[in-house]
Design a protein with these regions (language model features):
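Feature captures the catalytic ectodomains and active-site-proximal regions of enzymes
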Residues: 1-267
Length: 267
């Protein structure tokens, strides 16, 4: 649902949203595929060739990264299905969407788009006033969708380097949330060297564009292993370029991070 909002898709009238990720189905197992540079165009074409299976449900689909997509349609099926990134036992997808998944797998020798994270939109809770005046800049529908659901501004910028000058310009009018999803993506690809290179590149871009910025907060939103490709349940760091009441090494619950960083005058 969040991703559908970030991609400006129709979620009215209780439409259901489905995340679709490339995956191989074999030996009763779902194996997610993150290395789709050479196959994502043929996978996308195959999905669209069979898309008429969903006719009658007013389907809308948007692809965004290496064969991944968000699908919304008028359907009551909200199945509980396995989620990436780790392999999982195969679970049959119900209804016409299951027909689409099967047809694509048959034509692509086991490769298909498998749905997960299905749901409908609900009204969101109020956010801290200090967090309303923010423009989110990212290539991730997830990050953008969170901002959209909270009433914040958001811009989809696919190229990493392009996000930085856009962020500089937007800082003239609002605060900016600048998001780099590439670090997580390369971890799922199990490519440690590529992950290090992009971190070093981000560091150079920050120095180039924000060396004179006085108030920057760096967040690591979660851990992902570039060896196994799995998410890691670990304590994640954040760091500020300005003084706060937070002591070095102090654990701060997620719901208290913004108040503690911004201070009472910002709430």
């Amino acid at each position: 649902v969040i991703e559908a909002l970030g991609l400006d898709m129709n979620m009215k009238n209780n439409r259901t949203a489905y995340r679709l990720s490339p995956a191989y189905i074999h030996d009763n197992t779902i194996e997610w595929s993150y290395n789709m540079e050479k196959l994502h165009e043929s996978l996308t074409a195959c999905v669209m060739d069979n898309f008429d299976i969903l006719d009658g449900y007013d389907p809308e689909i948007k692809f965004f990264l290496n064969g991944r997509a968000i699908l919304t349609m008028e359907c009551d099926d909200i199945p509980d299905l396995p989620a990436p990134p780790m392999p999982a036992p195969y679970k049959e997808v119900p209804g016409v969407l299951g027909e689409l998944v099967g047809c694509v797998a048959d034509e692509m020798k086991g490769l298909t788009v498998y749905p997960w994270g299905c749901g409908r939109f609900n009204d969101q809770k109020n956010i801290y006033p200090c967090a309303k005046d923010i423009m989110a800049i990212s290539d991730s529908p997830t990050a953008l969708g969170i901002s959209a659901s909270l009433g914040q501004g958001y811009k989809l910028v696919k190229d990493l380097d392009d996000r930085f000058p856009i962020a500089v310009r937007d800082l003239e009018n609002s605060n900016v949330f600048l998001h780099m999803d590439e670090v997580d993506e390369y971890s799922h690809q199990k490519d440690p060297a590529k992950k290090v290179r992009v971190l070093e590149h981000i560091d150079r871009l920050m120095e180039k564009h924000f060396s004179d910025a006085e108030r920057i907060v760096y967040f690591v939103d979660h851990g992902t292993s570039s060896i196994t490709g799995e998410h890691l349940p670990i304590r994640v760091p954040f760091w500020t370029t300005f003084d706060t009441s937070i002591k070095n090494g102090e654990d701060v619950p997620l719901k208290r991070v913004i108040p503690r960083i911004m201070g009472n005058t910002w709430i």
